[in-house]
């Protein structure tokens, strides 16, 4: 009897054993997670565009074309409020006390980062991230613009021996927008744009 009971228990355990998983399809390509869209949900997002400028950021009324400059030197609170009105709530704020230009604070709105020193707006940096397509210069240059296309509307000055890579500038004197191409050549695309004071280590 005891032997029969043991056989029954072995049978139950075998029945409860999970089935072997089917072999994974080795040819299947893992899918990348979807990239979230930029917010651009500020109250003025539908009516206002933001243009990149060597002197700050220009806010342009889409209906009338009227532009107003958010100039370097304005208080941090004013700059943050102006951009949030279009880009939506800031993603984060941070600080770096070891920047080449001196201690600096930052407020990031998707691809756009505003730079501050002593509580004043002193620069901006646009990276190749979500939301970058919402910004361009008055001449239409933005992230993803090729060197060949940019040269049709502005003069591109390459920064020789730059430690930042394929660095270039647009403009002269104090009214310069800087940038970086992803690689050499006319087919290279703009990978970053910036103006004013930035946290670069050259």
Model-based region annotation:
Residues 2-8:
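Sec-dependent signal peptide recognition
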Residues 12-15:
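C-terminal motif of bacterial Sec signal peptides marking the signal peptidase cleavage site
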Residues 17-164, 186-202:
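Short helix/turn-capping signatures at newly exposed starts of structured segments
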């Amino acid at each position: 009897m005891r032997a029969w009971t043991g056989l029954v228990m072995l049978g139950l355990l075998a029945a409860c054993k999970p089935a072997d998983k089917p072999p994974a399809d080795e040819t299947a390509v893992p899918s990348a997670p979807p990239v979230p869209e930029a917010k651009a949900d500020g109250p003025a997002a539908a009516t206002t565009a933001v243009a990149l400028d060597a002197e700050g950021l220009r806010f342009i009324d889409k209906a009338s074309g009227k532009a107003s400059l958010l100039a370097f030197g304005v208080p941090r609170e004013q700059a943050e409020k102006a951009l949030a009105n279009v880009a939506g709530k800031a993603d984060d704020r941070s600080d770096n006390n070891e920047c080449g230009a001196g201690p600096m604070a930052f407020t990031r709105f998707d691809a756009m980062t505003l730079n501050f020193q002593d509580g004043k707006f002193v620069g901006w940096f646009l990276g190749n991230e979500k939301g970058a397509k919402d910004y361009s210069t008055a001449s239409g240059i933005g992230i993803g613009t090729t060197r060949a296309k940019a040269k049709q509307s502005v003069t591109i000055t390459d920064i020789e021996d730059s430690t930042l890579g394929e660095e270039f500038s647009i403009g002269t004197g104090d009214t310069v927008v800087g940038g970086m191409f992803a690689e050499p050549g006319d087919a290279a695309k703009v990978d970053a744009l910036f103006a004013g004071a930035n946290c670069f280590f050259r």
